[in-house]
A protein has these predicted regions:
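Glycine-rich phosphate-binding loop and adjacent beta-alpha segment
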Residues: 139-212, 246-247
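Short glycine-centered segments of the SAM/dcSAM-binding site in methyltransferase folds
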Residues: 15, 72, 96, 152-154, ...
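Mid-domain Rossmann-like dinucleotide-binding core that forms the NAD(H)/NADP(H) cofactor-binding site
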Residues: 51-121
């Protein structure tokens, strides 16, 4: 870590995390200080690496739902990187969280993260929900819309199923909101047009340090094992995030 030439940003040698839209594999990269968060001593770099993309995505999506205190919130793809953060952040916001997963095995540990209910698919969900955070897409997205009460919302964060979604007039979209989530949308920018991710990353890191947020690393290894990590992710053998250590 080298400080900015104008003296702004963290000091030399600071441990930082950033959301980088490009240059993530470079040995050196210029980063606007607004993109950076200085990490608490209790948060190691591997753990911090899970926060900028998955953590910030979940945080921004949960915020878009407004007040969640006492409300039923559905999270699909809850065992994935974004899903696990979404479960925890919605629960921290006071929601009754229903975590949907693909198999019983992938639901392990989600109650410990704050889920009030863990279900396989959505057939077990029989009562309406105030909102849904969807990471799966495909037919499950249409089913989630059916479950959302009038004036509720579905935020589609991802489409892990890689399947099309068919929506009909029966979904009554006039009385429901369907948002396609983009992580940078709504974020303030610096005068140079850089997204101001730093404060959100810092908040997540503080929650981790306080043991209020638990990143789940399902695979971790040296960077030369990257092909192994990719294959584990593609075959859905990783719950949470995969982390490569570069030394």
């Amino acid at each position: 870590m080298r400080p900015a030439s104008d003296g702004s940003g963290p000091a030399a040698g600071a441990r930082v995390a950033a959301f980088g839209l490009g240059g993530g594999w470079a040995e050196l990269r210029a980063v606007d200080p607004a993109e950076l968060a200085v990490l608490p001593d209790a948060v190691d770099l591997g753990t911090a690496a899970t926060l900028p993309a998955a953590g910030v995505s979940a945080l921004r999506a949960v915020r878009r739902l407004g007040s969640l205190l006492g409300r039923r919130v559905l999270v699909t793809g809850a065992s994935g990187g974004v899903g696990r953060f979404a479960v925890q952040l919605a629960a921290l916001s006071g929601a009754h969280v229903i975590a949907s997963v693909g198999t019983r095995a992938r639901g392990a540990g989600l109650r410990d993260l704050g889920a009030a209910e863990v279900v396989v698919g959505l057939d077990e969900v029989t009562e309406p929900v105030h909102a849904a955070l969807d990471n799966v897409g495909g037919p499950l997205l249409a089913q989630a819309l059916d479950l959302v009460a009038e004036h509720g919302a579905v935020i589609q964060i991802g489409a892990a199923s890689n399947q099309p979604t068919t929506l009909t007039l029966a979904h009554k979209l006039v009385n429901k909101r369907l948002d396609l989530f983009v992580v940078g949308e709504g974020l303030t920018t610096t005068p140079n047009g850089v997204w101001n991710f730093g404060p959100d990353i810092a908040l997540l890191a503080e929650l981790v340090a306080a043991h209020r947020l638990t990143p789940h690393i399902g695979w971790r290894g040296p960077w030369h094992r990257a092909p192994e990590a990719v294959e584990a992710l593609r075959s859905r053998r990783v719950a949470g995030k995969a982390v490569l250590d570069i030394t």
